[in-house]
């Protein structure tokens, strides 16, 4: 097309090298490039790996991690919002809020802590420090019995400081830091070994 406002690409993962599952995950990505059309044409039919972006990520040594958290199902207001337990002699339950709001306006506001869905939320963790990355063929970091709930890493890996949202095999999306912090940039870590 000669005239276009924006170009976005649809990419899919290659689950076979990781041996986690059979069906690929599909995602739509936006592109930042002066000439988007020629950049997209150069990518069609090619595998995009993490190593293609290591030069630009090495400038920051930080990544933003997007993903869906672990699902906890329906849970009460104490676990969901952390409200305090009421006195043991209180009426109509200890693990409920004492009041769900005023008489008027005559509806319950969204701010009232009530039972409902907890977890399986889309979340972004900003400024995770990138410690190291590599391939298993170059350096084997697998524990003897593999990682808990995951197994052994077969292809490539990235080690990040801190915890990452979601269960072991759920896909996550790494992106450049939107608001990189200077303190996180300055801190330096050296990878020794993994203890499980």
Question: Predicted segment positions?
Answer:
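Extended basic (Lys/Arg/His-rich) segments that typically form rRNA-contacting surfaces
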Residues: 1-74, 79-196
